[in-house]
């Protein structure tokens, strides 16, 4: 399968990054170009491989999820969530992660979308994954907008053609990894970005 870099919606990406850089100046946005270079060198697979799944009614599971839902494709946000689903006899079709929350869990999914950015690019390994970046992509890497793993998974579902998206476990007031100012600001941004996607396609929460 031929692989070329794609920015799915350049204007949306620019909007998202403008918000993120204003809200989270403490992050290493100045290293995102270097991260894109690393992503290009990792030999990832094409995002078109994900089109083998039926994206009509995806269910996106966030780390705090409790309830299962029926849908056409199972998307786990973070390796932690993929492992949590496995304990309930559900296998994730797609794991979306920047490998900072039980990274080994990404191997539990049928496929993975791994995000490479300025704060993690030196520790992202080579794998049979779709690599995403938050700058202009090169090589076999992609920009699907979004900023946190959670809202990026929702953008992915939308760009893959979802007619309706179900989200299980998105509770911005519940923090599992760490409870600090940066994490709370990220969750606030994720909430705003998911609402933006919900203006384009129905999004339900359980």
Predicted regions, residues:
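N-terminal donor/sugar-recognition subdomains of glycan-related enzymes
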Residues: 1-59, 67-69, 176-206
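Short hydrophobic beta-strand segments
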Residues: 56-62, 166-167
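Pocket-edge structural micro-motifs
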Residues: 62-63, 133
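Glycine-centered flexibility sites
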Residues: 63-64, 146, 150, 169
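Short, glycine-/Ser/Thr-/acidic-enriched flexible segments
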Residues: 65-66, 81, 136, 172
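Acidic/Gly/His-enriched mid-domain segments of enzyme catalytic cores or analogous surface patches
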Residues: 73, 79-162
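Buried, small/hydrophobic-residue-enriched core segments of structured protein domains
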Residues: 137, 167-173, 184-186
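Glycine-rich phosphate/pyrophosphate-binding loops
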Residues: 160-179
């Amino acid at each position: 399968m031929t692989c070329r870099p794609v920015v799915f919606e350049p204007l949306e990406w620019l909007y998202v990054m403008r918000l993120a850089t204003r809200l989270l100046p403490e992050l290493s946005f100045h290293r995102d170009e270097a991260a894109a270079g690393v992503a290009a060198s990792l030999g990832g697979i094409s995002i078109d491989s994900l089109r083998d799944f039926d994206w009509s009614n995806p269910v996106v599971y966030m780390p705090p999820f409790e309830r299962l839902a029926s849908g056409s494709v199972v998307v786990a946000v973070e390796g932690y969530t993929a492992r949590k689903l496995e304990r309930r006899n559900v296998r994730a079709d797609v794991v979306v992660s920047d490998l900072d929350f039980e990274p080994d869990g990404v191997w539990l999914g049928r496929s993975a979308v791994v995000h490479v950015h300025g704060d993690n690019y030196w520790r992202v390994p080579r794998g049979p994954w779709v690599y995403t970046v938050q700058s202009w992509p090169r090589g076999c890497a992609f920009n699907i907008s979004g900023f946190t793993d959670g809202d990026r998974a929702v953008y992915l579902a939308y760009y893959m053609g979802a007619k309706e998206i179900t989200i299980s476990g998105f509770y911005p007031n519940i923090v599992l990894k760490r409870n600090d100012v940066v994490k709370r600001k990220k969750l606030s941004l994720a909430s705003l970005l998911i609402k933006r996607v919900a203006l384009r396609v129905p999004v339900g929460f359980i």
